């Protein structure tokens, strides 16, 4: 997308090769047990939570942002690797803050207004916000470009059920991978933001 000045980052470049069989077999029952909606925790390809948990294992000692807390499922999945800290954001409380886990912090605010963040130490940003019109997502991408951030972005609902998000996904020029096979049934995408990481299937 936009060319940004190169900055030194604390997080080294990763070769993120996704092993479908490992994702499918990942045990996340301990996280499901903490969920407000355990009936939503289905197998990979229907539900994205095993994929999110798996991707958290590529990083150590970093911060992961969950943009769009809702009832906390995605934050729980992203908290799988306890060596990382997850910060989950929503504009309205929807019950997630009742979930207690040592490496999750819940915040009611726009993440772009959080001046406590160290973007050099943010490894993953998961974006799943309403109203799924593609406009907010594009504005968030522009914000991250202005910050000069580099890392892994996860997007939900990139398939034809949500045409505005699908259109936004198709216009992304950074290296990207449709990971819906082990993600959510409505489509899940992974983006190497500013070409930080190499994304592939194993």
What is the role of each PLM region?
Residues 1-202:
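A short alpha-helical cap/connector motif
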């Amino acid at each position: 997308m936009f060319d940004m000045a190169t900055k030194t980052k604390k997080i080294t470049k990763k070769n993120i090769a996704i092993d479908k069989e490992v994702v499918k077999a990942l045990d996340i029952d301990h996280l499901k047990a903490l969920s407000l909606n355990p009936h939503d925790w289905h197998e990979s390809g229907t539900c994205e939570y095993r994929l999110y948990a798996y991707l958290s294992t590529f990083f150590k000692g970093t911060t992961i942002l969950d943009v769009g807390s809702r009832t906390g499922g995605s934050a729980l999945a992203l908290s799988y690797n306890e060596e990382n800290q997850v910060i989950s954001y929503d504009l309205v409380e929807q019950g997630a803050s009742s979930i207690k886990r040592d490496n999750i912090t819940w915040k009611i605010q726009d993440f772009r207004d959080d001046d406590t963040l160290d973007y050099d130490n943010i490894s993953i940003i998961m974006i799943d916000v309403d109203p799924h019109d593609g406009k907010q997502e594009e504005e968030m991408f522009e914000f991250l470009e202005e910050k000069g951030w580099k890392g892994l972005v996860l997007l939900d609902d990139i398939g034809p059920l949500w045409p505005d998000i699908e259109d936004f996904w198709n216009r992304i020029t950074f290296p990207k991978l449709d990971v819906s096979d082990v993600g959510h049934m409505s489509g899940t995408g992974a983006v190497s933001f500013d070409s930080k990481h190499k994304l592939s299937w194993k």
